[in-house]
Amino acid sequence: MTLIYRKLSLPVLLLFLTLNTQAQQAPRPDDFSRWETAISAFEKADQAAPPAQGGILFIGSSTILLWKTLAADFPGYPVINRGFGGSQIVDATHFADRIVIPYRPRQVFLRSGGNDINAGKSAAQVFADFKDFVARVHAKLPATEVVFIGLCPTIARWKQAETNRELNRLVSEFAQRTRHVKYIETYNMSFDESGRPRSDIFIKDMLHFNAEGYRLLTTLVRPHLSR
């Protein structure tokens, strides 16, 4: 590993590798091989310091990957961060046997779906992918609670706001009728009084949260963590 890589934290390194791979070659849909570097890095980290069984797993795309304050935001909770930037729900499902099931978590918080919609999937398609993820987890961990952290609009992807809302609705209704599935509403957290997304909770790309964005997200997620 080069010197520059040694200086990067694991989340930043994974995001760098992901973006670098995507820049070199636009992958075909469901080309899971593009995530092998990120998943292998997680497995190596697990070998060096195995997470405790029965913890609280956070998985998903860049919102999870870049949540660098996750452990500090939830003191006293055994949280595990397994976000990989640019990923879709199908990717989390595909790699569940490697970065979900081995931890036997009591809860799995999934924040994903935005990249799916940005890639052209409908809310119904993303919802179907979410149900597949739940089925994969519950096939081996039937008592594990799967918690979907709902999507909220961003300035960079404002045109997808209604699709985000529709996906949230589908997941929310599914959670109400499905055991060990929960939904967290976040849609309104990014709106100002005029009904437009707040610019003060995003970094310059107007897509990813800054510290204030994560502070707000933390307040919405915290009540749903299980002791």
Identify the meaning behind each predicted range.
Residues 49-52, 73-74, 101-103, 139-141, ...:
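Extracellular/periplasmic catalytic domains that process cell-envelope and extracellular macromolecules
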Residues 13-15, 153-227:
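Catalytic His-Asp segment of secreted/periplasmic serine-dependent ester chemistry enzymes
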Residues 45, 95-102, 136-137, 224:
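A generic secondary-structure signal
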Residues 49, 98, 115, 131-136, ...:
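Extracellular glycan-modifying ectodomains
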